[in-house]
Structure formats: structure tokens, C-alpha cells
Amino acid sequence: MFKVHSDYFSKPNIDAIKPLVETAGMSVLTQSPNLRIWKQCNTRIKLLEEILAHYTNGIRRDDNGDFWMNPNSQLATTIAYRAHHKGHNPKFKQYPETFTLDDIITGKPIPQTAPDELQLSDEIVEDYRLTVLSIIEELQECYDVLGQLDINNTIDHKPLGNDHWNLLYEKPVYKHWYQLVSNRPLKDIRADYNYAKAKGVKDECSKILEESTMKSRRGFTVQRLMNAMRTAHSKGWYVVFDTLTLADDRLKDFYDNPNALRDYFRDIGRMVLTAEGRSVHDSSSDCYQYFCVPEYGTQHGRLHFHAVHLMRTLPLGSLDPNFGKLVRINRQINSLQNTWPYGYSMPIAVRYSQDAFSRAGWLWPVDSKGEPLKATSYMAVGFYVAKYVNKKSDIDMAVKGLGNKEWNNSLKTKINLIPKKVFRIRMSRNFGMKLLSMAHLSAETLMELTQVGYDVTPFNNILKQNAKKELKSRLAKKSVADVLEAQPVTTNLLKFMRNLTRTIGASNLQSFIASMTTKLTSTDISDETKNYVASAGIAVANLRIKSKWTAGGK
């Protein structure tokens, strides 16, 4: 779209940033405003131009203004589906009713006597005309945005727009674009114009790749949970484990409110803010964090949720449930018991060695036999919740026909009936992502941190993402043109795997891929990397867990 002078790129400069760009990855770098808008805008234009070409191939307008369509074209199927969806008359002009647009949908053979072109009805033509105009209008809006982008400006620049832009639109370019992308995602464009994305072929390679991706996400989620527990403990925060159930008479209300869980956690955050004497309109991210995983009971088929609340300050009215009791068996926190409006909740104080409750003077609880609960590590609660993460991941894979676990078809059907927005893990923004600052580290060390293995630190994926984020900040003042020039050639992993299968066979594929993705061990890394991991408190030696934690108690 933009022309750049051939002398613009400085090869030494491009060569210097190539390894940084490759390590950070375009998915991270495109979080920068200017680069993000540039990439998204070009992607949207490409899609809309494809759709426009689709709508203009296989149709002809004659000198009288009548529209004629080739019934064998791909466009014929699109127009037929649109007419059926909108309830338009499916008949063609000047052609017997023995063949209509509905017949194209059902795949009925076109009569041999049919002409090469069939005349569309006025109703269908009007819908077609308005559709094409709509595509052109969407394209023009994208061209307007693209015309305001400066490829030679830095990737972190937020484009505002010139005087011409201000005459056309009310908001600055970047705000206008963010709103457009949010209100009009690409999937909606495809759906509205009946231009479905081609479905990929499901074979052994695609299954291996999808299963590997899901397992990787599961592992990353568990790492975030465990790191959040570590951080909360180091800051002296309170940890509360909660189970949220759904009452029969509240099921409809829960499913009718897509923000039920979001509102619940927001209310808890506001309770913490109030306890700290702050406005409920403040952000609670610095004093409250949460993690929530759904569970679908395989025995009774009931959806419920397990949540971990991390609080700097307990809500007002939070009292030791065992104060003044002869037998200290209670662990539920009274101030949180009536906050879940869709059923029953059981907020339990998580007790472990050197917890915040002990420092606040809460009595140590006992079990049903009157014996003091065994003191465990703060990380043990993370392991306990992690099993629910693993269980949900197993269900997700089973629904997709992946994994080794056997699940009955009835369960798969029931899971598919639950809205995806409900049956997903949710957590606070940047939950468990905080690590020691990397601003002082060399670029070489940052690149090394993206490759360390689990034996260096069990938080290696979090380490990787933080290092990439730091690299992004160091590339922030590079131009869009520089970054695009420095980006590596991308490889279609699925295509690569399929080609590889022909050489080594499907049975050896997983082991071969594993050998290609080896991580750096403690003997491979530099002293600066070792020192950072140790200083951050995330070395393997710092995080040994010997005992297990259970969520029992009342």
C-alpha cells in the first residue's frame, strides 16, 4: 500500500534487529498500536477485496440494467443462501419454476435445457446491489484508515489523523479503529456476506497439532496460577478458596446474564477496595486477583466453579470463624458467604505455613478428629486447583475428539450445550504474569530467557512471555517498515508436519517434533540468566514442594 524509497532500509540496522524481532515474535510486536492497526487494516482489506471479487465473478449486468447469473458459479450458491435466509422469492425471471435458487442449495442438477445465464428477480437484485454497496463502504473506511498510517513512524505510535480525517470521522484514527474492530470482527463480516472460511482438513497431523496446542495452553495456565500463589504469599496477601454452585431456581437467571461471573468477581474486588477505604470505582488490580475454573460433574452432571481469591485486605466484617469456639473446625469466611446470587458458595480460608490469616491472629483450625490441620506450603493450593484445570482440559479435548481419555457421548452433548463463554477458565488481567523487572538485562539474555526449559524454572513459559514483552519495549521506537523488513519468513507448521509425515511416518512425528523443540538446561545458560532466575526467586531449588494440600474443612 505504501511506497518506501529503496535506500530507506539500512541493512546493518535491519540485521541488528532481526534476531530481536524473531525472538519477540510478530504476535507480541503487533500489540504495539501503529503496527497492530497496519497489520489488521491490511488483513481486513484483503478479506473485503476477496469478498468483493467473489460477488462480482459470475454475474453480469446488461444494458437494460438487468442482472444475469451463471447458475454454476460459486456466487450462485451465495446468492441462493442469502435469498433463502431472508425469505426472498427464489424464482428466476423468465424461467420455469422447475428450477429455483432453492434447488441450487439442495444441489439439484441444473436442467440441460437451462441457458448459461439466468435472470435474477428484482427482489434478489436489490439485495445484491445493497450488499455490494455495503462491501464497498466497508472497504472505503479501511482505505481511509490506511491513508492515515505512516509506515515510517514508530510501531508504538498512536495515529491521530489529519484535517481531512477529522472532517470525516469524530474520533482519532486509533480509537476509531479499535472501536471498528471490536464492533465488526472478521467473523461477522464473513457471516454477513455468506463468505465462510474454508474448513481445514482433519487428519492425524492436525489432531497432533491441536492437542499439542491445548496441552501447551493448559501448562501455561497452571504456571500462571502457581506464580500468582507465589507472588501473593511473598506480598502477605490472603488466599481464599471458593466453590460456586448453581441452584435449580437460579439456572435461567445465570444463563440469561452473560456477565454473571464477571459481575461477581468485580463485586468482590469492590469489597476489598471498600475495606481499604478506597473508591469502588478504582481499579482493584493492585489489591485483588482471582482465578476461576469451571467443572462439569461427571457423576451428577452439574456445572459449578472453583475459584481462588487473592486479597491484600479482607472485606469488612471478616472475622475468625473459630474465635470463641471450643472446637476450631470452621474455615468459611462469613463476609463472603452471601455474595454469589446464583446458588451456594463456600469461601474457605486457605491455611498454610506463615499465611496471612495467622499473622492477623486467626486461630489454627483442626480436623474432624480434633487434630490440628497439617501445615503445608502455600504452593499446595495451586496444585489442588491445577487438577481442575487439567480435568477441564481433558473435557475440552474429548469434545474435540482428542486425547486418550474416554468420555461418553452423552457428556459430550451436554458440554456442547453450555455456552463457551461460561465453560472457560477466567482470571484477572495479567494474573500470575508478574516477575522481577528485566529492564537491566542484555538483549542476549532476554533471548536466552525465551528458551529455558522446565529444569531451570517451572515458570519457564511466564519467563518467556515477560522476556518477549521486554524485547517489544526495546523495539518500540523502531519503524513499522523496519520491523516488517526484519520479520522472519513464517512456516506453515501444519504443512511442514504433513510433508514430514511422508518422510518419517506418522508414528515418529511427535518424537521428532519434540526433539526439534529442545529447551536450554541449567548448563546451557549464561551467568546473567542464572542470576536473574535466582534473584526472581523462581529457580527450581527455591520452589520444592514436599507435602500435598487438600481443600477440606467447613
From Swiss-Prot:
- Superkingdom to which the source organism belongs: Viruses
Q: Does the keyword Metal-binding apply?
A: yes
One of its Pfam families is Phage_GPA
Task: Kindly list the ranges of residues that form unnamed zinc fingers according to the record.
Answer: 287-309
What residues make up the catalytic site? Y384, Y388
Q: Which UniProt keywords apply?
A: DNA replication, DNA-binding, Endonuclease, Hydrolase, Metal-binding, Nuclease, Viral DNA replication, Zinc, Zinc-finger
Q: Name one GO molecular function term.
A: zinc ion binding
Note the InterPro entries from the entry: Replication_gene_A-like
Name one process (GO BP) from the record: DNA replication
Give the protein's function: The A protein is a specific endonuclease that cleaves the viral strand of supertwisted, closed circular DNA at a unique site in the A gene. The A protein also causes relaxation of supertwisted DNA and forms a complex with viral DNA that has a discontinuity in gene A of the viral strand.
By what name is this protein known?
A: A protein
Q: Which organism is it from?
A: Escherichia phage G4
From which lineage does this chain's organism come?
A: Viruses, Monodnaviria, Sangervirae, Phixviricota, Malgrandaviricetes
Q: Coding gene?
A: A
